């Protein structure tokens, strides 16, 4: 019988908490550093997505070729995330965070100076190596600084870039490209990166390192290329479906199967008694709370990131909006999330994340269900209202799930736990994007195959295809209610190790 770390280390609710219940100035300063890093890495993904057409014109390339500016970044992200937990314990989170910001900022500067598509892809990989470390490191730093009793509130702070980046990124990207040039979608990272470096150097405390811990070389050789290959195969599915009419192409199957086999081979090695320090500690799944949180995060990420693909496409392909207009229409979703996120963080710390996540998922499901009624001329008032409702739910979902997982861990396992959660989120997001893109492509191909369809009928059929895919998204979000019901419904009370952030 396994023992949840939360139960093993629980203390009475009236026990003194490290740092008190309020987010004091040192924690808020640390949170500011982490938010800056998160804004850079997450905004960059969505800002670049609106520049793909510009890259095609600038470099005289095909859509498949310029897609490598996104794919290269994603593969670098997948390769470096598994190493982050070990590197944080080995070298310290402050040193590694500074390195991550430096790599990302340097990569941004080089991307802006790229004179060919090949150079741009290479520099995007450098960006991805830095960006892949920023979010798991941010979770580790904030959780250690605040302690379990305040993890909900600090996760709400970290959720600002995670939830708002996909919404406001297209707005920023469209504005920069229209008013200046594509170079500025990268140059805008330079002042943020320089400020983040100086800020992190000043306010991040030194932390304990484990110089005696050995590196899991075999684990790295199995997991990092395994994740990269699997995600490459999955991300190739939409293109294969559109160009070949099937997902069972060599471009999809070969990397996806090879990656899955490498990941599967990593599991017994990680659990082996000979492996004292696995790259990703799968023994963390002995915690029931973490296991449930991982399942909830996977289901939610599939639905959320998959649906995030649909919104701008509907506005552009059905309603004729440009990239900037589509981004502006999505703003109510961000406003709703901003309203509930800080409240959800406080309540998660007071009454446990379980009730908060249940409420959030129910609200998102209601908002998503409204999109199953989409037509080619659905009123914008209805759409904006549905987006606002979804935003209210999102602010009460993603970060409470994260806090429920990390709040049960001992200080020395937080880095590995945050790395695990980020891997799950990255894989699930890629799967969700691919699945929803294929479902939408199927609908579009069916409409295009009908020779009797006139332009008006095509647009109406296209809107129906979006509504059908939103029905799948609604069901997927609703399924999150099952693991959410099993999340903790009482205040986390595990003490944080006061030496966890002592400088050396």
Language-model segment annotations:
Residues 55-56, 87-88, 172-180, 234, ...:
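Interfacial helix-cap and linker-helix signal at transmembrane-aqueous boundaries
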Residues 1-38, 42, 284, 289, ...:
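Transmembrane-helix exit segments and adjacent C-terminal regions of multi-pass membrane proteins
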Residues 26-83, 119-120, 181, 218, ...:
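Transmembrane core module of solute transporters
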Residues 81-223, 236, 377, 411:
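Helix-loop-helix hairpins in multi-pass membrane proteins, especially solute transporters
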Residues 37, 157-161, 215-218, 296, ...:
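Hydrophobic alpha-helical segments of secondary membrane carriers
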Residues 83-85, 89-101, 106, 110, ...:
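C-terminal module of multi-pass small-molecule transporters
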Residues 3, 178-295, 321, 329, ...:
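Hydrophobic transmembrane-helix bundles of small-molecule transporters
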Residues 44, 73-80, 130, 161-165, ...:
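MFS transmembrane alpha-helix packing/gate-lining sites
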